Amino acid sequence: MARALCPLQALWLLEWVLLLLGPCAAPPAWALNLDPVQLTFYAGPNGSQFGFSLDFHKDSHGRVAIVVGAPRTLGPSQEETGGVFLCPWRAEGGQCPSLLFDLRDETRNVGSQTLQTFKARQGLGASVVSWSDVIVACAPWQHWNVLEKTEEAEKTPVGSCFLAQPESGRRAEYSPCRGNTLSRIYVENDFSWDKRYCEAGFSSVVTQAGELVLGAPGGYYFLGLLAQAPVADIFSSYRPGILLWHVSSQSLSFDSSNPEYFDGYWGYSVAVGEFDGDLNTTEYVVGAPTWSWTLGAVEILDSYYQRLHRLRGEQMASYFGHSVAVTDVNGDGRHDLLVGAPLYMESRADRKLAEVGRVYLFLQPRGPHALGAPSLLLTGTQLYGRFGSAIAPLGDLDRDGYNDIAVAAPYGGPSGRGQVLVFLGQSEGLRSRPSQVLDSPFPTGSAFGFSLRGAVDIDDNGYPDLIVGAYGANQVAVYRAQPVVKASVQLLVQDSLNPAVKSCVLPQTKTPVSCFNIQMCVGATGHNIPQKLSLNAELQLDRQKPRQGRRVLLLGSQQAGTTLNLDLGGKHSPICHTTMAFLRDEADFRDKLSPIVLSLNVSLPPTEAGMAPAVVLHGDTHVQEQTRIVLDCGEDDVCVPQLQLTASVTGSPLLVGADNVLELQMDAANEGEGAYEAELAVHLPQGAHYMRALSNVEGFERLICNQKKENETRVVLCELGNPMKKNAQIGIAMLVSVGNLEEAGESVSFQLQIRSKNSQNPNSKIVLLDVPVRAEAQVELRGNSFPASLVVAAEEGEREQNSLDSWGPKVEHTYELHNNGPGTVNGLHLSIHLPGQSQPSDLLYILDIQPQGGLQCFPQPPVNPLKVDWGLPIPSPSPIHPAHHKRDRRQIFLPEPEQPSRLQDPVLVSCDSAPCTVVQCDLQEMARGQRAMVTVLAFLWLPSLYQRPLDQFVLQSHAWFNVSSLPYAVPPLSLPRGEAQVWTQLLRALEERAIPIWWVLVGVLGGLLLLTILVLAMWKVGFFKRNRPPLEEDDEEGE
């Protein structure tokens, strides 16, 4: 029994699942003539799902109303029996009275059987259809049961439809699947012809001849069936109070044992049309969205239920056949078919499937041919929008001779509120882009567009209107079509403009200019349009150019455009207006080749805010024409240049990491006719930057160049003349800086070309300049000794003899590496050879190796074998004053015969003449400007030194370095390597000697004797005899 509820409950689940999911961006909207501003709304009871189905209804007097189904309306017993409402048409809307039907459960005893109907949750109004003055409202979940003694048929949703004539008050009911067969019989017959789960009326339509056709997707145990009966016979055979009766003229489709139909929901949607060429018969279009294991299909049957065509879905579970519609969209007089698949999934660029929905258009060919492949696919654009859930023929909405359609996406549009898209018919079928997009005026979850009806003129203005149901909001919106004004626009202008013919004068400056006339003509036609019509005409000159770069202007205003208000008379015959324009001076613009485009656009005058215009403008509202400038290019007025370009480069190769500057030297020539807007185009590689460009043309030494992007590549464009005249030759030198070459490869390429805007042979051949890229690094190794020299006594004093507490002075050998660039180096290896291994016979005791700057060093053999704490005070000589070994003033004197005579010449102590300590250092990477240093701390080993009292030494260390690679993909010019040596001079001082006393006495006496002789000589020459200057008293006495 639960299975019987599947079809519509599944539908409801499909429609409600995505109310909480967000939609994608809406497609652009092109407004046509459905007024989206001045809407009419009808509302039903809250929670009734008012708007689940709807249709137009005309009574016998031609009055139009809207019949609306609300399948969850509460009945008299406050149970959800459903309901149907009839809304009289008023522009301002209004109340919708409900149609009265018998909504009570019924029980009748017929012989030994008890017949029962159950109308709670029957879904009255799940489908409604109007024909003539009759309204058909169906309740597909009305349940039925037959009891006989201890047996029953089981309570199942056979479905039923109620018919009403509102004017006469007549009522009837039609339930083609009711029967009195018990469940046991169905089981014995393997459920053949089992109609207990029909859900008759799930879909419904009435033919022009008045035959009611019902889809019952649960019939024959969910294979589906179709029931047909004339409306008149239903009324005539109906007897109130009788629950089981027979319409003699009805017909039902056949049961099938084909597995493809199992659970296919055949009858889920239904439509009628003409598809066999016989105008006296009507064919049935039946949708089965889960046919053949959810592939879906639509079948076209004749009046005897014989299949004429079968259209298969293209994607599993797309629900192909959820909706069907029949209309003639290409104006050939034959019905065409549209099929909706709202769950169709599209494969997108990210290889993910997106559920967007799709509508298939099948154009009926001439002759008795199958429909074949779809002529057009309309695919939704919004994720989970359910595009194609409903399709409605609109009639000829814009009165162009072709019928149009509306397609709903109930969960598309802004915030998933719903959207209806209008597609216009044309001779090829339908236009692939919507002419108008109607966004829901209701909040999210309204399912705006779940039901649609069109093709009826509700306001009697000669244009068909559209009604849209939004059962989630319990409302219906009426969109009225506005009259369409079809404009005809003509623009006349001369073919060419000769700059040399200056027949006009600018009013302000009296400057002669070349001028020409522009004639504009505008007319309008349309059905039921106003007698007086006002249009705005906007004229734009040279519209493809920026406003400041327009080449032609209006003579009077010197502007590039104008707007005119045109009043069309009662017959709307074309009116014309002429204005004059002029060509600007050639020095004021560059482009002399491209056509000068003039455009005329016609529009309706603006309306007040919130008000829609009374008519819609359509047709040729925009027209453009073009003229051109006469050039000095021979009789054909077509210039054909012959552009030549040669180029070379200086400053190569390029070095990675360096600030490279290249000079591109180019020679440009034109051996043909003038090249207009000629320019040199230089495509710069990655890392290159334009600096400046110079030419050898007098007066134009510095070229005007600009940069722009073309296909993600920076291009330098330098002007070469407008035009670049015949036989012109220009030498160009362009400076370009190039950096960031780490990923450039072994070369970079400059692409050079001369371009022009000429139509024939506009460009030169492309010249490629390949500049090699190389890597290089200059690494410098320097060494230093601290101090550079030492002075040590030649002999050992008593206090220091055999003493291990007093070490010799410190000696430091420092090696510094500096990468001067421009590149980075990898795998730097430094090897330092030091004389001595800290043994008693060595002159140096090596205390420690101190690397800096990332170096990792490993000495061999290990240093400081005695574990001397070199943090304790050890004599450290000043680099300015060489250190001496400390001695007391009292000297030790050797016996006279043993005194040394003189010091020996310095002896070189290196790894070539002494045991050696080797220090190996490695640095993984050394960037440009980086420094690294190794300091070797040592002190003199005095016991070994004093064993050779007269020897002087030069202590020499030696260092080498090399680099294994440079971290670039380009070959290096060379791998850095080098060496350095450090020397420390070790000098000896002899013992001081005592001075004899007689040497002192002789020196004193000699000094006194020399002083006496000096005084006597000075006295002899009168040095001590002086004349005093006279005093004042002496002068007075003299007077």
Curated annotation (Swiss-Prot):
Changing L847P: In GT1; uncertain significance. GO terms for molecular function: extracellular matrix binding; fibrinogen binding; identical protein binding; integrin binding; metal ion binding; molecular adaptor activity. GO terms for biological process: angiogenesis; cell adhesion mediated by integrin; cell-cell adhesion; cell-matrix adhesion; integrin-mediated signaling pathway; positive regulation of leukocyte migration. Pfam families: FG-GAP (PF01839), Integrin_A_Ig_1 (PF08441), Integrin_A_Ig_2 (PF20805), Integrin_A_Ig_3 (PF20806), Integrin_alpha (PF00357). Changing E355K: In GT1; type I; impairs surface expression of alpha-IIb/beta-3. The chain crosses the membrane at residues 994-1019. It is found in: Membrane. Ca(2+) 3 binds at D396, D398, D400, Y402, D404. Gene3D superfamilies: Bicelle-embedded integrin alpha(iib) transmembrane segment, Integrin alpha, N-terminal, Integrin domains. Chain A, domain 2, ntegrin, alpha v. Chain A, domain 3, ntegrin, alpha v. Chain A, domain 4. Keywords: Calcium, Cell adhesion, Cleavage on pair of basic residues, Disease variant, Disulfide bond, Glycoprotein, Integrin, Membrane, Metal-binding, Pyrrolidone carboxylic acid, Receptor, Repeat, Signal, Transmembrane, Transmembrane helix. Isoform 1 and isoform 2 are expressed in platelets and megakaryocytes, but not in reticulocytes. Not detected in Jurkat, nor in U937 cell lines. Isoform 3 is expressed in prostate adenocarcinoma, as well as in several erythroleukemia, prostate adenocarcinoma and melanoma cell lines, including PC-3, DU-145, HEL, WM983A, WM983B and WM35. Not detected in platelets, nor in normal prostate (at protein level). Ca(2+) 1 binds at E274, D276, D278, T281, E283. It comes from the Eukaryota. SMART domains: Int_alpha. Ca(2+) 2 binds at D328, N330, D332, R334, D336. Glycans are attached at N46, N280, N601, N711, I874, S878, N962. Ca(2+) 4 binds at D457, D459, N461, Y463, D465. A motif (GFFKR motif) lies at residues 1022-1026. GO terms for cellular component: blood microparticle; cell surface; external side of plasma membrane; extracellular exosome; focal adhesion; integrin alphaIIb-beta3 complex; integrin complex; plasma membrane. Changing Y174H: In GT1; abolishes the binding function of alpha-IIb/beta-3 for soluble ligands without disturbing alpha-IIb/beta-3 expression; functional defect is likely caused by its allosteric effect rather than by a defect in the ligand-binding site itself. The modification Pyrrolidone carboxylic acid is found at Q891. Integrin alpha-IIb/beta-3 is a receptor for fibronectin, fibrinogen, plasminogen, prothrombin, thrombospondin and vitronectin. It recognizes the sequence R-G-D in a wide array of ligands. It recognizes the sequence H-H-L-G-G-G-A-K-Q-A-G-D-V in fibrinogen gamma chain. Following activation integrin alpha-IIb/beta-3 brings about platelet/platelet interaction through binding of soluble fibrinogen. This step leads to rapid platelet aggregation which physically plugs ruptured endothelial cell surface. Heterodimer of an alpha and a beta subunit. The alpha subunit is composed of a heavy and a light chain linked by a disulfide bond. Alpha-IIb associates with beta-3. Directly interacts with RNF181. Interacts (via C-terminus cytoplasmic tail region) with CIB1; the interaction is direct and calcium-dependent. Interacts (via C-terminus cytoplasmic tail region) with CIB2, CIB3 and CIB4; the interactions are stabilized/increased in a calcium and magnesium-dependent manner. It is linked to Glanzmann thrombasthenia 1: A form of Glanzmann thrombasthenia, a disorder characterized by failure of platelet aggregation, absent or diminished clot retraction, and mucocutaneous bleeding of mild-to-moderate severity. Glanzmann thrombasthenia has been classified into clinical types I and II. In type I, platelets show absence of glycoprotein IIb-IIIa complexes at their surface and lack fibrinogen and clot retraction capability. Bleeding disorder, platelet-type, 16: An autosomal dominant form of congenital macrothrombocytopenia associated with platelet anisocytosis. It is a disorder of platelet production. Affected individuals may have no or only mildly increased bleeding tendency. In vitro studies show mild platelet functional abnormalities. Belongs to the integrin alpha chain family. This is Integrin alpha-IIb. It comes from Homo sapiens. The gene is ITGA2B.
